Structure formats: C-alpha cells, structure tokens
C-alpha cells in the first residue's frame, strides 16, 4: 500500500491512472447503457427527466475528466514521456503523485452530487439559469462544481509537470525537432490545459457565488448576463476537446510509423506544426458552440471561417498518416487495425464537424442528435480508438506480457460494428430533427433509436471481451522475448517491463 499511496515513480503513477481510468470508464459506460436503454423504445423507462439528465451529465463528466484524460495524459503520458526523453522520471515526482490522488476525491464529489437532492441535471455545460439556484436548488450543482475544481487543479499541476519535464529533462541529442511526436502532443496538450482550465475555474466559481453568495454575474436582474457564462465555458470547452484528441494523434503517429516499418512518420516536422496550429486555432473558435444565441452576422461569419481553417492542419495529419502507410506491406496486427479505424472514423467525425461549422446550417442542427453523432465519432471512435490502439501497442512494454492477438482482432470487429451501429443512425435522427437531452421522442424516430440501442449493447459486449482478454493475459503470464521488431522509438530499448528506475545513468542519443 505504501508503494502505491506515496509513489513518486512515473511508471507506478501511470499504472494507477490506467486502473482509475478503466474503473471510471466502466461507470461511464454503465451510464451510457442506461441512456440507450431509456431511448431503446418510445415512452418512458425511468420516468423522470431530471434523473435522465443527471445520467447524461454524469456520463459526460466521467468519460471526459475521469476516463479519457486520466488514461491518455496520466497513463500514457506518465509512462512514455520520461522513457521517450531518456529522463529518469518526471520533473516533479511528488506533485505527480498529488495530481493523481486529487482525482478519486473529484470523482467521489461528482458521484455524491448525483446522490443528494435531485442531482445535477444541467448537461455537462452547466449553463445558468438552469444551473442557478432557482432551477437547481440544493447542493448537487455545488458538489459538481467542486468536483470540477479538483479535477482542474489535478490537470493544471500535471500540465506544469509535463511542460517542465520536456523543457528541462530531454536527454543529450534529443533536440525539439527530433523529439518523438507523442511527447510533442503531450506538451501541446499541457499548454492547452494550462491556458484554458483557469477560465473554466473562473466561470464555475462565479456560478458558485451566484448560487450561494447572492452575486449576479449571470443574472440579468442584477446586471449580469448568462451569455457571459457561455463565452467563458466554451473558451475552456473548445480547447478541451482538442486536449482529448491531441495525445491520441501522437499515439497514432507512433503506431502507424512503427507498423508501416518506417523509421519516422511522413512529414514529422509538418506534423509538429500541424499540432501547434490546431492548439492555437482551438482557442479562437469557441463561439461556434453558440451560433443560436443571436450573435452579429459578422461574428458568425468569422467563427464559421476560423472553425473551417482548423480542418487544414487536421487534414495535413490525416494525409501524412496515409502517406506513412503508403507502399507498405501491412500485417494487420490489432494495434494497426485500431489505428486504421481511428483514421477512417475520425475523418468521418471531422467532416460532420465541417458541416456544423456553417453557422446557418448549425442553427438548424444545434442541439439535435446530429451534434451528438459528430462528437461521438471524434471521441468514441477517435479518442477511444486511440486509447485502444495505444494500450495494445505498448502493453508488452508496460507488462512484459503478450495479449491474445486472435481474440483482439475479433474484439476489434465487435467494437467497430458496435460503435458505428450506435452512432451512425444518430446523424439521421439529427437531420430529422430529434433534439438532444430528452428521454422520450415521437414514434417517427423509433427505428433508428432501436438500431442505436442495439449497437450500444454490441459495444458493451466488446468492452467486456476486452477486459477478459487482459485478464487472460495477466493470468497466463506469457513473457515477451522481443517486444517489437525494428523499433523506431527509444522506449523499446528498455527491459519488458522496464526497470523500476530506468535511465539511472543518463543516455547519450546519437543519430
């Protein structure tokens, strides 16, 4: 227990993040299955829209703050960044420990917020006046705000740690332009966290004082404006979605170049600039989430154009991955299957994003299932596919064990069918005008909702199968002899699993 509770070892802390993220992911998945069960037939199942919205809100918060971010940044980031830099550990090992241990209390606060009073049924955006004292009395929203505060502090500390580590602890020979793409992606992600989270903290603190200390930041009666909250929230919220996907971009670059048998990704400098461009542009497009609040036509024109510009660096990344794959004789290992699935489905999600960027179109599609379909394609088939690819790819390094490849391929097919069956029909529902965040719908929408719910059940089976595959691997203890052929990245020069203290003598990297 002491080893885990007080650990300052980046590998142990990374493992804690993985376990925490997997556990939170099961909770978040359970909530999503409840949502799909409710929508699996017309009429009521739970019979209470407040509870339904509490489930939707908790599903979003758990998946974002307690599943994707801990696994990608905390798990893969902690494990791989020091190994890829040739650093003995993170720059601030004890702060690293605190970053992790802030998350269980944060998750507990969120779960408690659902259990007291009526729960926080505000949606993950927590817009006032719905989240204000009149519409949401009681402690639920306050507890959710404190949960976000803790998760935010955790991420800010982690961000400072990663930035410092990369600036100060690169091994001799690893110049910035030769730094692995995954490390670059984590650094850019950390910068985005550092710049966006304080704004969220400000917004939810003002909401807290509006609710409890009689201020009126977001109350027109006292000269406030609920639209101010939306601007503050989305100034955080849009960079946040890039925070969720950028580490995935980094992992996919490594996996594709490795599996293509090439020593680096096509146009790796361009890949770095593309990620920097995405990170920068991510801060100046936030109001595309607010096309329906009545902004000036010139404001809408700007946010439409700026949003579409993000498609350019994203396209550079997609086509560089395809160019990396070009001309190779692929063996379809499980990791490359997930990576190919990522490229294909992330592109679909990106295209629906370009559709929604048009302010005039978005006014029709805003708050319909078209938006739900869009962001689940980039999250449920972008971020999650990247996590799956990365986990399978680096599992032999982390554990020194092998997974059952045949099962993993079957599991990929099950998940691929499941997620597409769940989310593709939602485009049709959105185009037909089915609104988000309602527990019931007119009979006309029944067919595609039934298909979507069947898809979610298939995905659930896929996830359970995945956990069984990991269990089987840990029980069977098949040791790795050679973890990978012709490795293109230095973390593979470690033992499998790596020694508790790798790089106790600093390496010199020559090329």
Curated annotation (Swiss-Prot):
Positions binding Fe(II)-heme a in this chain are 59, 376
* Function, as annotated: Component of the cytochrome c oxidase, the last enzyme in the mitochondrial electron transport chain which drives oxidative phosphorylation. The respiratory chain contains 3 multisubunit complexes succinate dehydrogenase (complex II, CII), ubiquinol-cytochrome c oxidoreductase (cytochrome b-c1 complex, complex III, CIII) and cytochrome c oxidase (complex IV, CIV), that cooperate to transfer electrons derived from NADH and succinate to molecular oxygen, creating an electrochemical gradient over the inner membrane that drives transmembrane transport and the ATP synthase.
List, separated by semicolons, the cofactors it needs: heme; Cu cation
Please report a single Pfam family linked to this protein. COX1
Q: How does it assemble?
A: Component of the cytochrome c oxidase (complex IV, CIV), a multisubunit enzyme composed of a catalytic core of 3 subunits and several supernumerary subunits. The complex exists as a monomer or a dimer and forms supercomplexes (SCs) in the inner mitochondrial membrane with ubiquinol-cytochrome c oxidoreductase (cytochrome b-c1 complex, complex III, CIII).
- What are the alphabetically sorted keywords of the record? Calcium, Copper, Electron transport, Heme, Iron, Magnesium, Membrane, Metal-binding, Mitochondrion, Mitochondrion inner membrane, Respiratory chain, Translocase, Transmembrane, Transmembrane helix, Transport
Q: Which GO biological-process labels does this protein carry?
A: electron transport coupled proton transport; mitochondrial electron transport, cytochrome c to oxygen
- Covalent link (1'-histidyl-3'-tyrosine (His-Tyr)) residue numbers: 238-242
Q: Where in the cell is it found?
A: Mitochondrion inner membrane
Give the enzyme class: translocase
The catalytic activity, as recorded, is: 4 Fe(II)-[cytochrome c] + O2 + 8 H(+)(in) = 4 Fe(III)-[cytochrome c] + 2 H2O + 4 H(+)(out)
Instruction: Indicate yes or no for the key word S-adenosyl-L-methionine.
Output: no
What name is this protein filed under? Cytochrome c oxidase subunit 1
Family under the similarity heading: Belongs to the heme-copper respiratory oxidase family.
Q: What is its EC number?
A: 7.1.1.9
Topology in the lipid bilayer is annotated as: Multi-pass membrane protein
**What high-level taxonomic lineage is stated for the organism?**
Eukaryota, Metazoa, Ecdysozoa, Arthropoda, Hexapoda
User: Where, by residue number, does Mg(2+) bind?
Assistant: 366-367
- Locate the residues binding Ca(2+): 38, 43
GO annotations of cellular component type = mitochondrial inner membrane; respiratory chain complex IV
- Transmembrane stretches in the record are 15-35, 54-74, 100-120, 143-163, 181-201, 232-252, 266-286, 303-323, 336-356, 378-398, 412-432, 450-470
Task: List the molecular function annotations (GO) for this entry.
Answer: cytochrome-c oxidase activity; heme binding; metal ion binding
What organism is this sequence from?
Drosophila simulans (Fruit fly)
Q: Which residues bind Cu cation?
A: 238, 288-289
* Main localization (coarse): mitochondrion
């Amino acid at each position: 227990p002491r080893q885990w509770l007080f650990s300052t070892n980046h590998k142990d802390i990374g493992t804690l993040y993985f376990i925490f993220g997997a556990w939170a992911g099961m909770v978040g998945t359970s909530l999503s299955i409840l949502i799909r069960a409710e929508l699996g037939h017309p009429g009521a199942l739970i019979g209470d829209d407040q509870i339904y919205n509490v489930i939707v809100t908790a599903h979003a918060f758990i998946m974002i703050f307690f599943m994707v971010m801990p696994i990608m940044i905390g798990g893969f980031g902690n494990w791989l960044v020091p190994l890829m830099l040739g650093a003995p550990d993170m720059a601030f090992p004890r702060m690293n420990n605190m970053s992790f241990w802030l998350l269980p209390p944060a998750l507990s606060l969120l779960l408690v917020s659902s259990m007291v009073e009526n729960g926080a049924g505000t949606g993950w955006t927590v817009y006032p006046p719905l989240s204000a004292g009149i519409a949401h009395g009681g402690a639920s929203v306050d507890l959710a705000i404190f949960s976000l505060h803790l998760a935010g502090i955790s991420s800010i500390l982690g961000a400072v740690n990663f930035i410092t580590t990369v600036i100060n602890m690169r091994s001799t020979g690893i110049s910035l332009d030769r730094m692995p793409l995954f490390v670059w992606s984590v650094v850019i992600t950390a910068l985005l966290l550092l710049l966006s989270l304080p704004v969220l903290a400000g917004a939810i603190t003002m909401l807290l004082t509006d609710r409890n200390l009689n201020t009126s930041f977001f109350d027109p009666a006292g000269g406030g404006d609920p639209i101010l909250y939306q601007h503050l929230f989305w100034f955080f919220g849009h960079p946040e979605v890039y925070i969720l996907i950028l580490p995935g971009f980094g992992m996919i670059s490594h996996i594709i170049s490795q599996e293509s048998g090439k020593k680096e990704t096509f146009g790796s400098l361009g890949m770095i600039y593309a990620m920097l461009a995405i990170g920068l542009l991510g801060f100046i497009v936030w109001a595309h989430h607010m096309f329906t609040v009545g902004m000036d036509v010139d404001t809408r024109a700007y946010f439409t154009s700026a949003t579409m510009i993000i498609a350019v660096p994203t396209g550079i990344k997609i086509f560089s991955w395809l160019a990396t794959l070009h001309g190779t004789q692929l063996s379809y290992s499980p990791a490359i299957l997930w990576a190919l699935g990522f490229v294909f489905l992330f592109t679909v999600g990106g295209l629906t994003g370009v559709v929604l960027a048009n302010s005039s179109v978005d006014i029709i599609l805003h708050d319909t299932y078209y938006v739900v379909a869009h962001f689940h394609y980039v999250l449920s088939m972008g971020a999650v596919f990247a996590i799956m690819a990365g986990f399978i790819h680096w599992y032999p390094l982390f554990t020194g064990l092998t997974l059952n490849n045949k099962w993993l391929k079957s599991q990929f097919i099950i998940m691929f069918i499941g997620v597409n069956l769940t989310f593709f029909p939602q485009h049709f529902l959105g185009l037909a005008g089915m609104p988000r965040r309602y527990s019931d719908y007119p009979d006309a929408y029944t067919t595609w909702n039934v298909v979507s719910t069947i898809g979610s059940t298939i995905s659930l089976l896929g996830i359970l199968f995945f956990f069984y595959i990991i269990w089987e691997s840990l029980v069977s203890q098949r040791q790795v002899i050679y973890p990978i052929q012709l490795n293109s990245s230095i973390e593979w020069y470690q033992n499998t699993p790596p020694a508790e203290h790798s790089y106790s003598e600093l390496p010199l990297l020559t090329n």
